[in-house]
Amino acid sequence: MKLQLIAVGTRMPDWVTRGFEEYQRRFPRDMALELIEIPAGKRGKNADIVRILQKEGEQMLAAIPKGNHIVTLDLPGKNWTTPELATAMNKWQLDGRDVSLLVGGPEGLAPACKEAAHQSWCLSALTLPHPLVRIVVAESLYRAWSVNNNHPYHRE
């Protein structure tokens, strides 16, 4: 199974890139984690946020291979514990489809992305900076993988 993290924003600080890559490289080849960056629309004083969100959403959806299971990261989503995420990941594997996880920009996800989603995951009730979300998602997915594979990384 392939995991895709599709996130709005490019040119992240080095610490974000290093943090994400640290967890990305830990995954085995049969569970690859890929990052796809979508350029953020220009936001200024007179920016048309609705149009920006729509365009970002179109680009995100275009990046998803046909047949992928789509999971949005969104506040109204389900709060998963590590064991619940591990169970979800196991179901995704048994389903035989690759998974695309969508992270929006400062205003969140486009309505079209939310409508296309098969599941929605609330990473935290806290407001997290979008660059940090990439690392937290990568670590959480790796931890869930480690639970499913009896790897010593996760301890209860």
Curated annotation (Swiss-Prot):
HAMAP family: 23SrRNA_methyltr_H. S-adenosyl-L-methionine binds at residues 73, 104, 123-128. The keyword Cytoplasm applies. It is an enzyme of class 2 (transferase). The keyword rRNA processing applies. InterPro entries: Alpha/beta_knot_MTases (IPR029028), RlmH-like (IPR003742), tRNA_m1G_MTases_N (IPR029026). This is Ribosomal RNA large subunit methyltransferase H. CDD domains: RlmH-like. GO terms for cellular component: cytoplasm. Specifically methylates the pseudouridine at position 1915 (m3Psi1915) in 23S rRNA. Its EC number is 2.1.1.177. It comes from Shewanella sp. (strain MR-7).
